[in-house]
Amino acid sequence: MPSKKNTKYLSLLVLFFTFSFGFSQNTSKFKVVLDAGHGGEDPGAIKNGIKEKDIVLDVVLKIGKILEKNNSIEVVYTRKTDVFIGLRERANIANKAKANLFISVHCNGVKSTAARGTETFVMGMSRTDTNLDIAKKENGVIFLEKDYNEKYKGFDPNNPETLLGLKILQEEFLDQSISLASEIETNFVKNNNRFSRGVKQQPIWVLDATVMPGVLIELGFVTHPEEGKYLSSEKGKEEMSESISNAIVSYKNNFFNGVVAERETVENSIPTKVDSNSESNSSDNSNKEKSNKTYYKVQIS
């Protein structure tokens, strides 16, 4: 059992880092890091010539173009061209920039052509096999990097025990991340008539390594015939970019300007969990009914 002296010391240390980080973020401009997933030799999900890396780069550049029109927002990109960027470098870019927000954009892809819908992830732990598969997919890019074992200190995205062993380094930002993720999904549903699979917590390395609120957005499934066409279309990219940009600006107004809008606590905003497998296999009629409402499925355990 730690002594009272050690407990007091640790408490002071935590306060020091909390205040230090808080002041480091208090810049004249709201700084957003936009991260287009995959790139270069890592195409991400592919179906019928549609590549995830191309879609997400286009969407990120469009988001940046919208945000840069706002003089109070500074945009930082992890990549602006078709190049491979390692997960550690992506996190380092965000941390060195002392960003206020980290946005990583991806597309989903599975063997089934029936799965569809958007979903947005925040850092957290989950024991469901479905979500662990997604975590493996997004973390698997690690193996393309040289000396990955040394860089990531034995982190193995294919080992569920490793995933479950990830520590949440940014619990203080969890509420903000969920708030942003919820607004993004709401915008997709209301503004773009998309089917939302919800907001979820998941042990994704790049979110764990960035010391700021952050989300990983899955724009949809390139493996779904209709959704794949929408994701790769100019209309789809424009709509998704606007929905994400609007959510970011709303987040900035709520949190960065010193005025936090009243909202439900994290505990009170978590409804009963919905089985994601049952959603993927539901009928088209059922999906159409669901598409008019956003289902938030923040999985704590």
Question: What is the meaning of each model-derived region?
Answer:
Residues 284-301:
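Solvent-exposed beta-strand motifs enriched in subsets of small alpha/beta binding domains
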Residues 25-155, 170-174, 178-182, 229, ...:
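Catalytic-core regions of hydrolytic enzymes
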Residues 151-160, 216:
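Flexible hinge/switch segments at interdomain interfaces of large molecular machines
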Residues 278:
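Conserved HRD-motif arginine in the catalytic loop of eukaryotic-like protein kinases
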